[in-house]
Design a protein with these regions (language model features):
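Conserved, structured core segments of small domains
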Residues: 1-143
């Protein structure tokens, strides 16, 4: 099973030019090495503050671009991992080991696999999507 592990932003992570704690960065590096060694990580990255981002809102066939920053830090994302683990319990156990600084929140969400769409897609459609996904860089077919 694949999961997206979402590190929620904080007021500190949303500050422009925020200086990260060197000790926390060292601990996070070691944690990431453990995840990689265990074969859990498929992708991972941290994100710049929302002040460097935009939102594109769609309504009635048109779109509007809204520049950051965005005010509700608790609704923003500071970083993420994509993990492949046996189940959500394994993901939870890994998250519990995550080094954090102060108050933090991490959300775990299961990623759809092709077989999840079996009730609405034909086998041919699923195979086509699996083949297209395999063409993406750093991707494996998920069927």
């Amino acid at each position: 099973m694949r999961f997206m592990v979402i590190v929620k932003a904080s007021p500190e992570s949303e500050k422009e030019g925020a200086v990260h704690d060197p000790q926390l960065l060292l601990e996070m590096g070691k944690y990431n090495e453990e995840l990689i060694k265990a074969g859990v990580v498929l992708a991972m990255d941290g994100l710049h503050p929302s002040s460097k981002g935009v939102r594109v809102k769609f309504s009635g066939g048109s779109h509007t671009v809204v520049d950051g920053p965005f005010t509700e830090a608790k609704e923003l994302i500071a970083g993420f991992w994509i993990w492949k683990v046996r189940n959500i319990d394994e993901a939870i156990e890994w998250v519990k080991r995550c080094p954090v600084d102060g108050d933090s929140e991490v959300e775990i969400r299961q990623i759809f696999e092709m077989e999840d769409f079996a009730p609405v897609l034909t086998e041919e459609q699923i195979q086509h999507k699996v083949a297209k996904r395999a063409e993406l860089p750093n991707q494996t077919a998920n069927k």
